Design a protein with these regions (language model features):
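Extended alpha-helical scaffolding segments
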Residues: 1, 6-371
Length: 371
């Protein structure tokens, strides 16, 4: 049963066309393979189901009466059938994104045939409550619209905080639902929300499954309600600062490579990944430790900035120490626009540039902590 659910929702877009007498629309992978799935994890299975089973659409409107696929007046059997976005939860949860025929032998499934099934336009498909959203603007009309936001392989979920909190546009339905439950006093004011993420990366033309993604993030639920706007700005600012710090670390790796005469440009990406690895667990602990009722945003931000500065500075020192003698002596690199000019790159110079950028990003910090 779990395999069948997975096939229906995550199947790739490899050719499954059967009809040869008529053109059929392109439909892509199964629905869950096209979105960045998130859900809320409870303390047990029942609580998990209740925390994700939305009895209201996000925004508070009632769903239309439930019509699962087996209760449709006219059962759909056509290949690659485009349908309207579901207006009721049961239809969405039971939609046949693939037509699967199971081959049975002595009460066992020994094979199957699969064709493309139902699909709908993902633009503004807010009936789907378990996805992040990307805010976009039509270049011709200027109208704003939203598309599901897929998870980026290797990118920690806390770096998507703006999309979880709706700072980036539309709040995911399950997040809205849990803040609604808390607002109705069905969840504690001290509730720690555990957000889980699942995603799939496909290969060229989505013809095969290439990689999968899982992550989880815990935080105080009050951070995500309407009264938590100040905290959302605070956390989002620190996420953005981490992005800038990662670029500063990557630039140090580039400059050290040039100082050593190495033209290989892969070191910067590896250095950025190393920085994110260093700050990953500390950031998660900092985020989970925020209590909106007793903490002050300025103080908590300063607490994190001290950690971030210290971790980045330590990583920078290690990179310089490991750069080697050639990097300390230095290397001249010709100017790309004017070959007659050249610039001297050395490890000490690269380190000074790194420290300047880091201190500019975190001006109240030094290697010993808060000034």
């Amino acid at each position: 049963a779990r395999w069948l659910v997975s096939l229906n929702n995550y199947d790739d877009a490899a050719a499954k066309k059967k009809a040869k007498d008529r053109p059929l629309p392109s439909m892509g992978p199964g629905w869950l393979g096209r979105i960045g799935v998130i859900y809320v994890k409870g303390s047990n299975l029942f609580e998990t189901l209740m925390r994700n089973l939305m009895f209201l659409q996000d925004g508070g409107e009632l769903w239309e009466p439930d019509v699962p696929c087996w209760e449709l007046e006219d059962a759909r059997s056509g290949e690659r059938t485009e349908v309207a976005c579901p207006d009721n939860f049961a239809e969405l949860m039971t939609m046949q994104f693939r037509r699967a025929l199971l081959e049975r032998k002595e009460n066992k499934v020994v094979g199957y045939t699969v064709l493309g099934g139902d699909f709908f336009d993902s633009t503004n498909a807010f009936a789907e409550p378990m996805t992040l959203w990307n805010k976009k603007e039509d270049k011709k009309t200027g109208l704003v619209y939203y598309d599901p936001r897929k998870h980026e392989m290797g990118k920690q979920l806390w770096r998507e905080f703006s999309a979880i909190s709706d700072r980036g546009g539309h709040k995911p339905g399950v997040i809205w639902w849990n803040t609604y439950l808390q607002g109705r006093k069905l969840l504690s004011r001290k509730e720690i929300l555990q957000v889980c993420a699942v995603g799939v990366e496909y290969g060229a033309q989505s013809a095969s499954m290439k990689d999968c993604y899982t992550d989880a993030l815990s935080m105080n639920l009050e951070l995500l309600n309407e009264l938590g706007r100040t905290w959302q700005i605070c956390v989002d600012d620190e996420v953005n600062n981490c992005e800038q710090a990662a670029r500063i670390v990557g630039r140090l790796a580039q400059n050290l490579a040039l100082a050593a005469g190495d033209k290989n440009d892969t070191g910067a990406e590896a250095a950025r990944a190393q920085f994110y690895f260093a700050v990953d667990q500390p950031f998660r602990r900092w985020l989970q430790g925020i209590d909106p009722e007793t903490d002050e945003p300025v103080e908590k931000a300063a607490e994190w900035q001290e950690q971030a500065y210290r971790l980045a500075a330590e990583l920078g020192r290690q990179m310089v120490e490991q750069a080697g003698t050639a990097a300390f002596i230095g290397h001249r690199v010709p100017d790309k626009k004017n070959p007659e000019k050249s610039y001297l790159y050395t490890a000490p110079k690269a380190y000074n540039i790194f420290l300047y950028g880091l201190r500019k990003l975190y001006p109240k910090q030094d290697e010993g902590g808060t000034e």
